[in-house]
């Protein structure tokens, strides 16, 4: 099974994760330190019962191939060991980090 890192389980990530899970060929590691809030319900794939829970925990509960990492990605070391890193956040600091990595070692996509 290929290992994929999805950074961000919000507006983009919450809809991408079920699509990746459906393929059933990936171990999907979701990284996001955010908690579901009521304001997220209108544009993210979460429900009233999810409010107050970590977004990554909700995704790992719903989908069999998802592992929860309710943390912020801060270092290049955290990006290592994955076949593909998919960035689904609009955090400029994190995106700068991605643009500085050795693309021979880390393959990544920026979906923002």
Language-model-derived ranges and their functions:
Residues 1-112:
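Adenine nucleotide-associated cytosolic modules
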């Amino acid at each position: 099974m290929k290992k994929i890192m999805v950074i961000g389980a919000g507006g983009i990530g919450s809809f991408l994760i079920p699509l990746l899970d459906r393929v059933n060929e990936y171990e999907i590691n979701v990284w996001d330190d955010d908690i579901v809030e009521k304001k997220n319900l209108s544009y993210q794939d979460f429900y009233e019962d999810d409010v107050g829970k970590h977004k990554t925990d909700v995704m790992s509960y719903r989908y069999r191939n998802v592992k929860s990492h309710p943390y912020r990605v801060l270092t290049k070391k955290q990006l290592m060991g994955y076949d593909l890193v998919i960035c689904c956040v609009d955090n400029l600091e994190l995106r700068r980090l991605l643009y500085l990595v050795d693309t021979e070692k880390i393959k990544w996509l920026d979906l923002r």
